[in-house]
Amino acid sequence: MRTEVLCQWVDTINPVISPSQWESCKVEGLRLNPESDTWLAIDLSPDRKQAALVASQKLEGDKFQVILLQTWHNPSNLDDKALANDLAEWVRKYPVQLVAYSARTASAVAARLAPAGIRTEPIDGLDYAQSCDELLGAISSQRLAHSGQDELTKQCLSAVKLPFGDGGWVMGRKVSNAVICGAVASAMATHYATKANDGVDIVIV
């Protein structure tokens, strides 16, 4: 990926997603099914000025879709109560199984959802690293489908790999030097959309 800086294009160091692979996953006219199981994921930027909400649903076969539902911006600081209220409105529109979030960035929002009966689940550490791997694998194999939303594309292609542990990696919020809340939320939503219904992906006969 290349980024424009001072009217010059420079390569993004160690990008997570290849623009050509992302483009190959684009499917025109994708829409969420109001009757299908839905997983939501929310992520906030480290400075708490940006946030994004992403939904995922399974499609036919082993494919699934991710859709950017909403973004937030506040030049000072986001209001966790306002975000929780907005998110609750989306929960009412679809059969949401749970809302995934990072305890590092969105714990205040999640804490407001639980009393309303909305199931939440944190994804951090090894689980977050796994979700990043799952996102990249789904993109490279074209199991992931997206509608080509400009903002989601921008954020996903801005994500940079950050080494994690011995041989692992994650999408680094700070090292990306850009807003990647949508990319992080996509990874978390992917984690649930890629799970097999019976818990088994491979059957040996």
Predicted segments with their positions:
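Gly/Thr-rich phosphate-binding beta-strand-loop-beta motif of the actin/hexokinase/Hsp70
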Residues: L32-K58
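Beta-sheet entry/capping signal
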Residues: D37-W39, Q50-A52, K63-Q65, V96-V99, ...
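ATPase catalytic-site recognition across NTP-hydrolyzing enzymes
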Residues: M1-I42
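Nucleic-acid-processing active sites and adjacent nucleic-acid-binding tracks
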Residues: R31, A55-Y101
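Flexible loop/turn segments at secondary-structure boundaries
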Residues: T12-P15, D47-A51, G61-K63, P75-S76, ...
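Metal-dependent DNA phosphodiester-chemistry modules and their immediately adjacent helices/loops
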Residues: V66, K93, R112-G199, V205
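Short, flexible loop/turn elements at secondary-structure junctions
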Residues: C7-W9, L44-R48, Q57, A103-T105, ...
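Short glycine-rich phosphate-binding loop at a beta-alpha junction
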Residues: Y94-A110, E121
